[in-house]
C-alpha cells in the first residue's frame, strides 16, 4: 500500500486461504484467518461495536481488541463515534473499515476501441474515470496501460490499496498473460511489469473472471453461478461454492470457441463454423440483425438464445449451478434471447432438478472495473 508521501507500507494483508482439515493449523494460519474474518464482517455488515464484532465472528473479545488495534494502527479501520443508547453504562464505540481513507485503481482492457480505467472507493463506487485509445498491441499496449494507471494514481491524495486489471485472453494466477491475440501478447508478464513501474500491488486476471467477482461481491449473485460476458467476444467466469474457478490450464470459462451444435453455423474469427462467439457476440448479433432487417430481429435473437442454452446446459448439470448471469448490451440480451436460452436449458436438463435455474442480465455497470477492485480487496484485505 502506498501513502501520499510515496513511501510503501510494509504491512500487507495476504489473500484468504481455506484451512485444510488434514493440515496442521499453525498459529500464523489461524491469525490470518481471524484477520480476514474480522475485515470481511465489517466490510459487509458495516459499522459495529467491538462486542458486536465478537458476537458476529465468534472470536473472543480479547482477540477482537487485539486485531482492531492493529487495524487502526495500519489505517484500515477507524472509530466512527458512539452508538446512541438509553440504557445504563458507557455507550459503545462503533468501528468500521475506513472506506474513505483508501482508493483502488481498476483497469479494463477488454473494450474494442479503448482501455478504460477508474479510481474506485473500497465499496466499488467509480469516483473518477479515464480512458486511452487502444493501441494495436505489443509494447505499445503495455505503455498505454502503464500511462493510464499512472494518470489515475495522480488523481487521488489518499493511499491507494492496489491496482486491478481485467485483461482479455488466458491469464495465469501470477498475472502472466499466456495469450491475448487481440493485444499481441504471449507469455507477457503484465502484472510483474506494472507492479515494478507503479511500486504498488498489482493484480491481473481475465476480464470475465474479474466480472464474476464483481457480481458475487457487489451484486445479488448466488454461491454457484456462471457469468457470461458478451461484447466483441464471449467469455465466462465461474463461481462454485463461493470460490472462483480457473482450471488446470487457467482457461475455465473459455466457452466462446466451443462449437454449438452439429449443423455448422456462422464462420468464427478462429476459423471454425458455429462457435458460440459467432452466434452470440454483440458484434455478430448486430451484423446479422442488420442483414436480416428489423422485422426478423426476434428470429436472430431467438436462435442466439437457443445456442446459448445448448452451450450452458451441460455446464449447469456438471457443476449444479444456480444461475447464469449475462453481462452485455441489454437491448440484445433482455427478452427474446434470455427467454429462448431459459427454455432450451430447461428442455436439455433433468426435469424437476434444474427448473429453478435463473438466466438473468446483470444490473451492474462497469463490471470489469468493479471486479478489478474486488481482486485488490481480496488480495490486500481478504475481503470478497
Task: Identify the meaning behind each predicted range.
Residues 1-133, 137-159, 218-219, 262-267, ...:
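ATP-binding/phosphotransfer module of carbohydrate and carboxylate kinases, centering on a glycine-rich
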Residues 159-166, 170-271, 275-276, 377, ...:
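Phosphate-binding/catalytic loop of phosphoryl-transfer enzymes
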Amino acid at each position: 500500500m502506498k501513502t501520499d508521501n510515496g513511501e510503501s507500507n510494509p504491512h500487507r494483508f495476504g489473500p484468504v486461504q481455506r484451512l485444510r482439515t488434514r493440515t496442521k493449523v499453525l498459529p500464523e494460519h489461524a491469525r490470518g484467518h481471524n484477520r480476514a474474518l474480522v475485515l470481511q464482517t465489517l466490510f459487509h455488515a458495516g459499522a459495529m461495536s467491538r462486542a458486536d464484532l465478537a458476537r458476529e465472528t465468534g472470536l473472543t473479545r480479547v482477540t477482537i481488541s487485539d486485531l482492531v488495534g492493529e487495524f487502526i494502527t495500519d489505517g484500515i479501520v477507524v472509530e466512527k463515534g458512539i452508538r446512541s443508547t438509553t440504557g445504563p453504562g458507557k455507550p459503545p464505540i462503533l468501528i468500521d473499515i475506513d472506506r474513505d481513507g483508501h482508493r483502488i485503481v481498476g483497469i479494463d482492457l477488454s473494450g474494442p476501441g479503448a482501455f478504460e480505467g477508474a479510481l474506485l472507493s473500497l465499496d466499488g463506487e467509480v469516483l473518477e474515470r479515464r480512458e486511452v485509445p487502444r493501441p494495436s498491441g505489443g509494447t505499445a499496449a503495455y505503455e498505454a496501460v502503464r500511462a493510464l494507471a499512472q494518470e489515475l494514481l495522480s488523481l487521488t491524495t489518499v493511499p491507494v490499496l492496489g491496482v486491478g486489471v481485467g485483461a482479455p485472453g488466458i491469464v495465469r494466477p501470477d498475472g502472466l498473460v499466456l495469450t491475448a491475440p487481440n493485444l499481441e501478447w504471449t507469455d507477457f508478464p503484465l502484472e510483474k511489469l506494472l507492479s515494478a513501474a507503479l511500486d504498488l500491488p498489482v493484480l491481473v486476471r481475465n476480464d470475465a473472471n474479474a466480472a464474476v467477482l464483481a457480481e458475487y461481491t457487489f451484486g445479488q449473485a448466488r454461491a454457484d453461478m456462471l457469468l457470461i460476458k458478451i461484447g466483441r467476444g464471449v467469455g465466462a467466469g465461474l463461481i462454485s461454492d463461493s470460490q472462483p474457478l480457473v482450471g488446470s490450464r487457467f482457461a475455465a470459462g473459455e466457452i466462446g470457441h466451443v462449437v454449438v451444435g452439429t449443423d455448422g453455423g456462422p464462420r468464427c474469427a478462429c476459423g471454425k463454423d458455429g462457435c458460440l462467439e459467432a452466434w452470440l457476440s454483440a458484434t455478430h448479433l448486430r451484423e446479422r440483425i442488420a442483414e436480416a432487417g428489423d422485422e426478423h430481429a426476434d428470429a436472430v435473437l431467438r436462435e442466439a438464445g437457443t445456442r446459448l442454452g445448448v452451450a450452458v446446459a451441460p455446464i449447469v448439470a456438471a457443476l449444479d449451478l444456480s444461475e447464469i448471469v449475462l453481462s452485455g448490451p441489454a437491448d440484445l440480451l433482455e427478452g427474446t434471447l434470455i427467454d429462448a436460452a431459459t427454455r432450451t436449458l430447461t428442455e436439455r436438463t433433468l426435469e424437476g432438478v434444474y427448473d429453478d435455474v435463473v438466466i438473468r442480465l446483470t444490473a451492474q455497470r462497469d463490471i470489469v472495473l468493479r471486479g478489478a477492485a474486488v481482486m485488490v480487496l481480496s488480495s490486500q484485505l481478504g475481503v470478497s
